[in-house]
């Protein structure tokens, strides 16, 4: 392969990785702009371009680098088209699963772990910035909530379909570019953890890292996601624990791990026993805001198969 072509493709790999992570985590925002058909075309073109860059950069996919358990699950998902009662929808879902899985393989092979995390962070930073910009634009210049672009001419837009609710200056909850507060909060949490890990490890760029931490915390506050709040407490506790045990000896680590597992099991037991009190503190109902109803409906649908 031409060395010049290979080196250029190598330089484009991080951009390809950012595009994949962006579409994977913020695809709803792209879909809100271009609609389902436009989103499908954009995703297909981006995925094709990324694979071309992947091969031109000299990367190769070998069977030994593909997880047997994951690939078996993907095959099972695709085979479910055979016995599904909704074959068209299941076939579309199978195609999406294959596309998503191929993108994951591309990213996993193309980058070492540290570089992959940096590429991931770049994509999540774009999502966070776009979310703030979009929320500000709607609150300052539009003055009312907006639906996805392809729904602008609908006579009636369902309540849950609105993209931005113009709630930034009312304290939230905001939905950002992704159009859903829970995924947006999850993105902010992942970015926060990555920034903290790199900040602790590298100990540089203090002002920049502090700004990103503030941006992520702002998203977490404005989204008000109870699920992500719990995940944040668990993640930060795990991060602090790992930072502590890295300075301990072998036997001290074993003891610390046992203490941590015991504490985690105790907290979990208390949370289960005092479920009503815990959900009340989080400002949610005992079935976590209708999730019991959702699962009941899903079980009804599963009975049709």
Located regions from the model:
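Transmembrane signal-anchor hairpin modules in multi-pass inner-membrane enzymes, especially those
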Residues: 1-79, 115
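Membrane-embedded alpha-helical segments of multi-pass membrane proteins
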Residues: 37-53, 94-103, 183-191, 230-237
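Structural signal for the C-terminal ends of transmembrane alpha-helices
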Residues: 47-60, 106-116, 194-203, 237-248
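Transmembrane alpha-helical segments and their membrane-water interfaces
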Residues: 85-139
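Membrane-interfacial entry segments at the cytosolic side of transmembrane helices
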Residues: 114-123, 204-210, 247-262
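Alpha-helical transmembrane segments of multi-pass inner-membrane proteins
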Residues: 121-224, 228-243
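A membrane-periplasm/extracellular boundary helix in multi-pass inner-membrane enzymes
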Residues: 133, 137-142, 240-286
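TM-adjacent membrane-interface loops and short helices in multi-pass inner/ER membrane proteins
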Residues: 292-305
């Amino acid at each position: 392969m031409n060395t010049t072509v290979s080196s250029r493709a190598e330089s484009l790999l991080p951009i390809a990785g950012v595009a994949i992570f962006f579409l994977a985590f913020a695809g709803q925002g792209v879909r809100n702009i271009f609609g389902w058909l436009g989103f499908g075309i954009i995703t297909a073109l981006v995925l094709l371009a990324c694979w071309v860059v992947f091969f031109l950069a000299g990367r190769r996919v070998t069977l030994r680098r593909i997880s047997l358990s994951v690939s078996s699950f993907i095959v099972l998902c695709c085979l479910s088209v055979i016995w599904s009662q909704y074959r068209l929808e299941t076939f579309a879902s199978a195609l999406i699963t294959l596309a998503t899985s191929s993108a994951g393989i591309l990213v996993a092979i193309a980058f070492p772990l540290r570089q992959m995390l940096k590429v991931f962070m770049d994509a999540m930073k774009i999502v966070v910035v776009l979310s703030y910009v979009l929320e500000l634009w709607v609150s300052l210049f539009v003055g009312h909530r907006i639906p996805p672009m392809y729904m602008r001419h609908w006579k009636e837009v369902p309540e849950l379909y609105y993209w931005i609710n113009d709630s930034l200056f009312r304290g939230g909850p905001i939905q950002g570019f992704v159009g859903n507060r829970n995924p947006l909060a999850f993105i902010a949490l992942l970015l926060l953890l990555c920034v903290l890990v790199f900040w602790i490890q590298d100990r540089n760029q203090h002002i920049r890292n502090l700004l990103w931490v503030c941006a992520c915390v702002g998203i977490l506050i404005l989204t008000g996601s109870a699920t992500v709040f719990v995940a944040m407490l668990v993640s930060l506790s795990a991060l602090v624990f790992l930072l502590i045990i890295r300075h301990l000896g072998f036997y001290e680590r074993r003891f610390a791990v046992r203490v941590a597992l015991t504490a985690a099991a105790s907290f979990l037991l208390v949370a289960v026993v005092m479920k009503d009190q815990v959900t009340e503190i989080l400002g949610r109902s005992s079935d976590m805001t209708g999730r019991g109803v959702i699962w009941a409906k899903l079980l009804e649908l599963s009975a049709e198969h």
